């Protein structure tokens, strides 16, 4: 059955809204790169499996960053995959540094940019040093806002800086993150950080921003709700409010509520099924957990039940680059 939303839109608008052309181009590229393997079971089956993986959100696993950020669905799928793969960090009560969270992100996306992880950590840490420890839930919800709304936040940072310096509000802001490189956020002075800007004026500028641009923005009504509760606010105060807002998390739809963050019955059942298939593994894990008094800083590496549709032949080269960056971060 076609949804009412689908029937209400012309075909070309629906295809553009759902980024169908992006997925068709990616599917054809994968088909050409793996044509020898795919020829064994047919092109029709390949396209069926590809678009099933898109619907399930597993198509972004181990892919390059440019693809992961290409569509809102890809971004939401990556957020959901990161949560499901590493929620044991939160269940164990582990606290990790920004660099350690970045290493986890690189396990799913080898070329994930460090700058984006740093920006997410700054929302949590504020004025604290970047090597401070963070809980999984704090980092995850901050990362969700920074990653999903990255272009919006770049423009918001420029608007905030303009308000601090009293510049003309008619300045047009053009995001440039399509290449995967993010413009450095303007340095905010100490006075600006303490005093912030007038919330009502900031709200007007953000309403105009959402009307002008077509990239992903938080629901304007919820942004207005946040800003209506204060007279003045700082840039990072605004980001913290976004990351903790229940309605914005629901509107984005990638993560559960904070109270349900550690519960994923479907994944638990799948992991139990996989563990049972490995002789002696369950007993070994049980014995290890009983012998240990403190939770490990490093979560156990349990094989993900997800499998990429077709492992790219470039994965080894990408992984080598990821290892080098990880080694540098540890030195």
UniProtKB/Swiss-Prot annotation:
Gene Ontology cellular-component terms for this entry are:
centriolar satellite; cytoplasm; microtubule
- Sequence ranges of Acidic residues compositional bias: 318-331
Q: Which residue stretches belong to region Required for interaction with TPGS1, LRRC49, and TTLL1?
A: 1-225
- Entry's transmembrane regions: none
Region ranges (Required for interaction with PCM1)? 1-111
Sorted keywords for this record are:
Cytoplasm, Cytoskeleton, Microtubule, Phosphoprotein
Q: Where is this region: Disordered?
A: 292-331
Region annotated Required for interaction with TPGS2, chain positions: 112-331
Q: Which GO terms describe its biological process?
A: regulation of protein complex stability
Phosphoserine occurs at 319
Q: Where in the cell is it found?
A: Cytoplasm, Cytoskeleton, Microtubule organizing center, Centrosome, Centriolar satellite; Cytoplasm, Cytoskeleton
Gene Ontology MF term list:
protein-macromolecule adaptor activity
What does this chain do?
A: Regulator of the tubulin polyglutamylase complex (TPGC) that controls cytoskeletal organization, nuclear shape, and cilium disassembly by balancing microtubule and actin assembly. Regulates the assembly and stability of the TPGC and thereby modulates polyglutamylation of the microtubule, which antagonizes MAP4 binding.
| Similarity annotation | Belongs to the CSTPP1 family.
**Could you describe the subunit structure of this protein?**
Interacts with PCM1. Interacts with TTLL1, TPGS1, TPGS2 and LRRC49; the interactions link CSTPP1 to the complex TPGC. Binds to alpha-tubulin.
Q: What is this protein called?
A: Centriolar satellite-associated tubulin polyglutamylase complex regulator 1
Q: Please state the gene responsible for encoding this protein.
A: Cstpp1
């Amino acid at each position: 059955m076609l949804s009412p939303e689908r029937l209400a839109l012309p075909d070309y608008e629906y295809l553009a809204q759902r980024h169908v052309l992006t997925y068709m181009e990616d599917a054809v590229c994968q088909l050409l790169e793996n044509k020898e393997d795919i020829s064994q079971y047919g092109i029709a089956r390949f396209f069926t499996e590809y678009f099933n993986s898109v619907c399930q959100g597993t198509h972004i696993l181990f892919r390059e960053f440019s693809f992961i950020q290409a569509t809102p669905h890809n971004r939401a799928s990556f957020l959901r995959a990161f949560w499901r793969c590493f929620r044991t960090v939160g269940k164990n009560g582990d606290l990790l540094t920004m660099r350690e969270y970045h290493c986890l992100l690189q396990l799913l996306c080898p070329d994930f940019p460090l700058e984006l992880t740093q920006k997410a950590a700054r929302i949590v840490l504020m004025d604290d040093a970047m090597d401070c420890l963070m809980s999984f839930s704090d980092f995850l919800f901050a990362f969700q806002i920074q990653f999903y709304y990255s272009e919006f936040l770049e423009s918001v940072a420029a608007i905030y800086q303009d308000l601090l310096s009293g510049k003309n509000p008619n300045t047009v802001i053009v995001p440039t993150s399509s290449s995967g490189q993010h413009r450095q956020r303007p340095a905010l002075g100490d006075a600006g950080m303490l005093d912030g800007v007038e919330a009502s004026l900031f709200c007007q500028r953000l309403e105009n921003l959402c009307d002008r641009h077509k990239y992903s923005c938080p629901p304007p009504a919820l942004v207005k709700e946040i800003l209506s509760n204060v007279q003045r606010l700082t840039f990072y105060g605004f980001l913290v409010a976004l990351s903790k807002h229940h309605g914005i998390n629901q509107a984005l739809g990638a993560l559960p509520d904070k109270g349900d963050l550690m519960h994923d019955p479907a994944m638990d059942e799948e992991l139990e099924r996989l563990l049972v298939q490995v002789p002696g593994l369950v007993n070994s894990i049980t014995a290890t957990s009983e012998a240990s008094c403190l939770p490990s800083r490093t979560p156990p590496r349990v094989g993900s039940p997800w499998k990429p549709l077709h492992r790219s032949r470039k994965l080894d080269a990408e992984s080598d680059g990821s290892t080098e960056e990880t080694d540098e971060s540890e030195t």
